[in-house]
Regions:
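Active-site loop immediately N-terminal to the catalytic Tyr-X3-Lys motif
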Residues: 145-151, 173-174, 224, 242
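Alpha-helical segment proximal to the catalytic Tyr-Lys
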Residues: 125, 169-170, 245
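Short C-terminal tail/terminal secondary-structure segment
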Residues: 94, 236-237, 248-264
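Canonical Rossmann dinucleotide-binding motif of NAD(H)/NADP(H)-dependent dehydrogenases/reductases
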Residues: 3-35
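Active-site helix of classical SDR
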Residues: 120, 156, 164
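Catalytic Tyr-X3-Lys loop
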Residues: 81, 98-117, 132, 136, ...
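Short, small/polar-rich loop/turn modules that mediate ligand/substrate recognition or access, typified
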Residues: 172, 177, 247-249
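C-terminal helical subdomain
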Residues: 180, 203-243, 247, 256
Length: 264
């Protein structure tokens, strides 16, 4: 299927692996020029090498919690038609009142929410002026199904979704369509780190830690496995395309059936 975006330029944040890299690969296959950014410079270079896109993929190492870095990213990226914001952290875990500090809350706020505000502020106004744009944020299953030990992540991702809804309503008349995807337990550097840490703490293999997590913490994930980054990227690529020209403010769940509730 031709998504109708060949020749466009997409900025992908959090591009050093996982969903960011998978999205880059999907869009590259549609003839899109890429600007890839991440705080992890080595990981970003490795992603670019695996993509093998040559001059069709530029890389910019940037910390999106730093306004000056976002301004530099804007200068180096040039004209951008598509923004995909996957960057973020899981944040501290534990009792939201007794275990989580003010700094923990602020770290998640800046990494998961304000980073998105900053890149949108930098790149969406020119899209509005041009009369065309696509913006896709990554939220989480936690928005619909908060977990009691992930309060900072729950709150930050819920804030992202409300940002998406507000931006979608305001900018759609100008041709800029804003949507989001809500993954569950996806294969990524982030979940790899979580599972490796759990495995070390419990004295088991990473594979056993994943199996235990699915059985004990995510029994409602009906497919019983981690999702693949490519499965999320396929939905993101659709939302970036001309094929999604009547989709505004939607939050697509790519969660293996983890969330069973109905959106009204």
């Amino acid at each position: 299927m031709d998504l109708g975006i060949s020749g466009r330029t997409a900025l992908i944040t959090g591009a050093a692996g996982g969903m960011g890299e998978a999205t880059a690969r999907a869009l590259l296959g549609e003839g899109v020029r890429l600007v890839l950014t991440d705080l992890d410079g080595d990981g970003l270079a490795e992603t670019a090498g695996r993509l093998g896109a040559g001059d069709r993929a530029a890389t910019v190492v940037a910390d999106l919690t730093e306004p000056d870095d976002v301004e530099r990213l804007k200068r180096e990226a040039g004209e951008v038609h598509v923004l995909v914001h996957t960057a973020g952290i899981t944040g501290a875990k534990g009792d939201p009142l007794t275990d989580i500090t003010d700094d923990d809350w602020l770290d998640a706020w800046h990494s998961d929410f304000m980073s998105g505000v900053r890149v949108a502020r930098a790149f969406v106004p020119p899209m509005r002026e041009a009369g065309w744009g696509r913006v896709v944020f990554v939220t989480s299953e936690n928005v619909a199904q908060p977990y009691d030990d992930e309060a900072v992540y729950n709150a930050a991702k819920a804030a992202v979704l409300t940002l998406v809804k507000g931006m979608a309503q305001r900018y759609a008349p100008d041709g800029v369509l804003v949507n989001s995807v809500a993954p569950a337990f996806i294969e990524s550097p982030m979940t790899d780190y979580m599972m490796e840490k759990t495995a070390e703490e419990e004295g088991v293999s990473k594979e056993q830690a994943i199996e235990d997590f699915l059985e004990e913490d995510r029994p409602h994930l009906v497919l019983g496995r981690r999702g693949k980054p490519e499965e999320v990227a396929a939905v993101i690529a659709f939302l970036c395309s001309e094929r999604a020209s009547f989709v505004v403010g939607s939050n697509y769940r790519v969660d293996g059936g983890s969330v069973a509730s109905i959106d009204l």
